[in-house]
Amino acid sequence: MKITTSKQMAFALLLFASTVFMACNGSSDTNSNNDSTAVTHSDSVQHNAIATHAHATISGTYTDTTVNGSASFDQTDGKVKMVLDLTIPAKANKSVAVHLHEHGDCGDMGKGAHGHWNPTNKQHGKWGSSSFHSGDIGNVELDGQGKGSLTLETDLWSIGGDSTTNILNRAVIVHGGVDDYVSQPSGDAGNRIGCGVIQ
């Protein structure tokens, strides 16, 4: 009877030790899975923090020229859609050039924005041609009341992406003349009569 009890006790201890070992091993796997889930959740939160909408309110840079307008930017499926609306009564029945410039600074009659935004170091040209700046939007035709609009959709821009595509904190510049799409470095588009910062 003593031998049977000892064998039973030894078997029970062996069974207990195996159970503890398996439980510890399983616990380690569970913690590993939790860590992986936590990282995935963190990545997801960072991804959701990227903006999908931006806006610029465009105002005149000269006291003798009324310029009102807005540019709305929405990002969906890797593309940014811009809807630009302008009202410039002094330019009724004419066209004006619009470009994105490097810096979001409308000071000094728009000169604070510096040159055209050109992260790919290409020659100035017409949007969609073999060579053009990422900021070369083009000409906007105005009606008899000086109102005009333009819609553009592209995968060359992003809202909050890397420096080669990010349009945030750039300036939307309205020029007094038209872009000839040939003259370097900016299409001979004339003075900067309107400006707005993309935010």
Give residue spans per PLM region.
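N-terminal leader/targeting pre-sequences
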Residues: 25-95, 100-199
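Bacterial N-terminal signal peptides that target proteins for export
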Residues: 2-12
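C-terminal motif of bacterial Sec signal peptides marking the signal peptidase cleavage site
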Residues: 19-23
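Extracellular low-complexity Ser/Thr/Asn/Gly-rich intrinsically disordered segments
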Residues: 1-3, 24-26
